[in-house]
Amino acid sequence: MSLEPTQTVSGTPPMLHQRTHKQVYPLRMETIPILESDSKATLQSNEPTQKDEEETEYFENKQSVSNLSPDLKFKRHKNKHIQGFPTLGERLDNLQDIKKAKRVENFNSSAPIADDNHSGDATANATANATANATANVNASAMPAPYMPYYYYYHPMNAPTPAMIPYPGSPMHSIMPNSSLQPFYSQPTAAGGPDMTTPQNISSSQQLLPAPQLFPYGSFHQQQLQQPHYIQRTRERKKSIGSQRGRRLSMLASQANGGSTIISPHKDIPEEDFYTVVGNASFGKNLQIRQLFNWCLMRSLHKLELKAKNQEEEGELEHLTKKSKLESTKAETDYVDPKRLAMVIIKEFVDDLKKDHIAIDWEDEEKYEDEDEEKILDNTENYDDTELRQLFQENDDDDDDDDEVDYSEIQRSRRKFSERRKALPKEPKKLLPNSKNVENTKNLSILTSKVNAIKNEVKEWAVTLDTSRPDLEWQELTSFSSQPLEPLSDTEEPDLAIADVETKLETKVDELRYQSHILNSHSLALNEITNSKVNKLNIETMRKISSETDDDHSQVINPQQLLKGLSLSFSKKLDL
């Protein structure tokens, strides 16, 4: 459904009257019908009685909505403003309309409305445009509805520009909700600018309103448009602070002209967390290694100083208990503790290293082994050892002789050092055995002992089996069984007789078990031999039969003859 409004223009000056059409109230449905506007005299007054009269005239002059669609019904409610602000219930209704927006077919939200600063000639143009739009709508009603995705309530738009801020003449200024159901509004023409109501400029002047807001007030919306500038600036500032972490330490440490120094972190930060506060990586890995090395040295020096201080305090207390104060002062003036001298030397070394007075290449790595050191020393062109060069310079104050360095002394000293180191006897490296290897050796010794015991037992059984004569044992058993039993003498004690009977019975049972075992083993062996022979005979007979028979004249096999042949072969084998 497309509803186009008619434009009304009066001859009043633009400064006196700001509103250009009749007051429009929000609807519960998805469309806002815009009809012919009344005179500006009725719009100027804000009394309730005049508004009631306007509503009666509006409903009398309005075309019946039932002619458009029998199911479409507009539910209108009054919006009586008190001092230009809507009530709480109206604002809740507007918010509900925004949240419960629905898809509307054939909905045209464009409604070009003319401005106040046009002359009487513009009236004729407006009426002509209205008639043309009416005829176009009649023709367009017969055409099919354009396809619009259900999730598009308004076309995509770019960021809101200052020209899209609601001007006082628009009905959405502090009255209408910023919803997706609002029509297009033309921009007010600037003084001396082109006429935006001409047919050539009407399409270009129509712009979408900004995205819907929860607050319908224009002043709050203007504040929101200005707010992201400050938010963006604070976000950029936070990003710069996070990315420049440790940059100040790196800049102080990388300053030239003798001003570079290493600043230690806070004492509450442990040594394990030094990597978290290391300098910025943009200054290179060299500076990071230098900072970590110096921080560890400074922290260890601080611990040594505290330890030495505690020892001195304990020594002073013990010394005061033994001697008087005068003697202690004399001893202090005469004697110098070597530990203090060592602490002073270490402190000076740490200070020089902290202030970068000692030239060290922190990224240098040993790329060669001891065998290739002599080859490196021969190549004097690439040799550059700053510490040794400073030690072997003849004139430290002469700047002209800095480039001319005698490498012969350096080479000679390095050769002597390498020869001396090679002459020292190298102790063999002690390697710890692997726990798995130790466990495997123990298991191997246990298993070998078990295997040897089993082998010895097998040998003993073989000897006993070779020496035994089962036939003689059977003869002895038969002779014993045939002999009559001798009566026991009364003189023998019954206990000794029972013991002898038990021992004899055990020996006989053992012999019987042994003989039964031998018979069983012989029977199993004979069975296996016969089975193997039968299988071989079957294979041979089948092979002969297959070779003798032809495809055309196949002979019938007689099973009786086969059985006879098998029986004869078995009888021959048994006779043998």
Curated annotation (Swiss-Prot):
<dbReference type="GO" id="GO:0008608">
    <property type="term" value="P:attachment of spindle microtubules to kinetochore"/>
</dbReference>
<dbReference type="GO" id="GO:0051301">
    <property type="term" value="P:cell division"/>
</dbReference>
<keyword id="KW-0158">Chromosome</keyword>
<dbReference type="GO" id="GO:0000776">
    <property type="term" value="C:kinetochore"/>
</dbReference>
<keyword id="KW-0498">Mitosis</keyword>
<dbReference type="GO" id="GO:0051754">
    <property type="term" value="P:meiotic sister chromatid cohesion, centromeric"/>
</dbReference>
<dbReference type="InterPro" id="IPR018247">
    <property type="entry name" value="EF_Hand_1_Ca_BS"/>
</dbReference>
<keyword id="KW-0597">Phosphoprotein</keyword>
<keyword id="KW-0131">Cell cycle</keyword>
<keyword id="KW-0137">Centromere</keyword>
<dbReference type="GO" id="GO:0000940">
    <property type="term" value="C:outer kinetochore"/>
</dbReference>
<feature type="region of interest" description="Disordered">
    <location>
        <begin position="185"/>
        <end position="205"/>
    </location>
</feature>
<dbReference type="GO" id="GO:0005634">
    <property type="term" value="C:nucleus"/>
</dbReference>
<feature type="compositionally biased region" description="Basic and acidic residues">
    <location>
        <begin position="420"/>
        <end position="430"/>
    </location>
</feature>
<dbReference type="Pfam" id="PF08202">
    <property type="entry name" value="MIS13"/>
</dbReference>
<keyword id="KW-0539">Nucleus</keyword>
<comment type="function">
    <text>Acts as an essential component of the kinetochore MIND complex, which is required for the spindle checkpoint and kinetochore integrity. MIND plays a role in establishing a bipolar spindle-kinetochore interaction by joining kinetochore subunits contacting DNA to those contacting microtubules.</text>
</comment>
<feature type="compositionally biased region" description="Basic residues">
    <location>
        <begin position="235"/>
        <end position="246"/>
    </location>
</feature>
<dbReference type="GO" id="GO:0000922">
    <property type="term" value="C:spindle pole"/>
</dbReference>
<keyword id="KW-0995">Kinetochore</keyword>
<keyword id="KW-0132">Cell division</keyword>
<feature type="compositionally biased region" description="Polar residues">
    <location>
        <begin position="1"/>
        <end position="11"/>
    </location>
</feature>
<feature type="modified residue" description="Phosphoserine">
    <location>
        <position position="250"/>
    </location>
</feature>
<feature type="region of interest" description="Disordered">
    <location>
        <begin position="412"/>
        <end position="437"/>
    </location>
</feature>
<dbReference type="GO" id="GO:0007059">
    <property type="term" value="P:chromosome segregation"/>
</dbReference>
<dbReference type="GO" id="GO:0000444">
    <property type="term" value="C:MIS12/MIND type complex"/>
</dbReference>
<comment type="subunit">
    <text>Component of the MIND kinetochore complex, which is composed of at least MTW1, NNF1, NSL1 and DSN1. Interacts with NSL1.</text>
</comment>
<feature type="region of interest" description="Disordered">
    <location>
        <begin position="1"/>
        <end position="22"/>
    </location>
</feature>
<feature type="region of interest" description="Disordered">
    <location>
        <begin position="35"/>
        <end position="64"/>
    </location>
</feature>
<dbReference type="InterPro" id="IPR013218">
    <property type="entry name" value="Dsn1/Mis13"/>
</dbReference>
<feature type="region of interest" description="Disordered">
    <location>
        <begin position="227"/>
        <end position="246"/>
    </location>
</feature>
<protein>
    <recommendedName>
        <fullName>Kinetochore-associated protein DSN1</fullName>
    </recommendedName>
</protein>
<dbReference type="GO" id="GO:0051455">
    <property type="term" value="P:spindle attachment to meiosis I kinetochore"/>
</dbReference>
